[in-house]
């Protein structure tokens, strides 16, 4: 679906135009066209392909979706793919995709499965005509910067979730629920990392070595995006390591609890084994057993059993088994 199609000259909005008028405006000096599509149909993308002479491989990637974040050059056109990540109202992490085609006199952005609008990007860019005057390279930076900035709230939410889980790990009664929550958190971290890591490498092409002509005037701005991605990469690595450690600590706590239960069971088994041993001795059917004929034999036997059990109980209690 077409969101908007606007022509700009010298950094200022020239006119809202129809797709069939694009070819007229891109011919004007110091003018470029910025087209935004959302969940575009095949027909819409193919129409833009003909209008801007886009490379068929890049168009194929934009149509099929589910692409790894990347930045590629096709002649005079720069093609970028980014993944978006955001939480739904039901606290599920969902991903979307933004594809950008940038040429010397046009910018085409296509967003698929992205709930958040990019209209704010256009509004902010139009408030800075001296920057928008730099052309499609600046527009590409503005869109990329907006997508990357939206990673920060997601990472902060993941950090808060991990802090909450860590606080519960050392509480009594460790349960499988904590392991499940940490495992799901690791999956979310991996999802965000799959969006950040490839994009970090891709943006690196725009700030190191040979820079595509479209981005020559905005190289320092892409450096800012690169720095943000580096910070996110570091934060995600730290989160993943902490989550792994949390699982290991959780399993260690579970092992310790099992060991404590085993020690208590072994201690009580030892106490009852001693009592059973005495009862078994005096329960043997021998005719010559002096204790059986003794008047105080029964009370004495009970006393010995009680004393033995008491001593064992004291020793186990002192050792921390009971």
Predicted regions and their residues:
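Peripheral, non-transmembrane regulatory/ligand-interaction domains of membrane transport proteins
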Residues: 1-238, 291, 321-322
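Hydrophobic alpha-helical transmembrane segments and their immediately adjacent juxtamembrane loops
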Residues: 53, 227-322
